Amino acid sequence: ACLVGSEMCIRDSIKNMWKGSYMMRVELITHTPEPEKVVATAAKLCYSSSDIASLREGLTEEKTKSFIERLVSIGHESPMEHVSFTFGIEGISRACSHQLVRHRIASYSQKSQRYVSESGFEFITPPSIEAVPEAKAEFDKQMDQLLECYNKIANILTNTHEKAFLEQGMSEKDALNKAKKKAYEDARFVLPNACETKIVVTMNVRTLFNFFQHRCCNRAQWEIKAVADEMLRLCKQAAPELFKNAGPSCVMKGKCPEGAMSCGKLVEVKKIYGEMNNVE
């Protein structure tokens, strides 16, 4: 979907937004097998006296599709919590991951800056900075300075801690390893929001619906919007009926909840996310 104003189209941004910088990657690692049939089975159980095996046997592809359409139309979303999707996300900034983890009904595993050295950290350059040579030069200079500062502090702390551990009777190998970990813990305080991170995310379908409503919106910050759009594309490939109407609130609910802050592009946004159903 396209961002407001002069920002580039999200469909192109997955390939181009990080051009000249660190590339974002979103991978669907795994998901519940037969996701649509699982949802349909769970939902049908609520209204049937049949045993579960019989319910599953009676769910043809057409019946599953029909049942899911009905669930979505009446807003019966609790059966969708039985299906989860796990994503591997790389090449995003810490600024982006901080927004991501605010979606609380989910599971996250993120690369630690406490236990992993950032001695050569990659960073994400916003497109608006990338497009202006003067801003880009200043941004890169600051990243270089922060990297140098991080390494200096890490080395100073490593030497300090190593000396203390040796005095406590540790072996040289153990003292050095423990000193490095302890140094990373505090040296990371100088790292910028631009610092690249990696994270594994698991969400159930109901949570994904809520996530897409907020983060696929034109008013979402550009980076997490790009992540959300790519996650949605992958979900649509894996479970097209479940996610057929997924997207920002104006797509899922039929109207924009932003009031005076609306982007005013409801028709255009609906068209873009409708076309996403046909993209593989």
Predicted feature descriptions by range:
Residues 2-10:
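Short, small-residue-biased leader/transition segments that mark boundaries at the very start
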Residues 16-280:
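Family-specific signature for flavin-dependent thymidylate synthase
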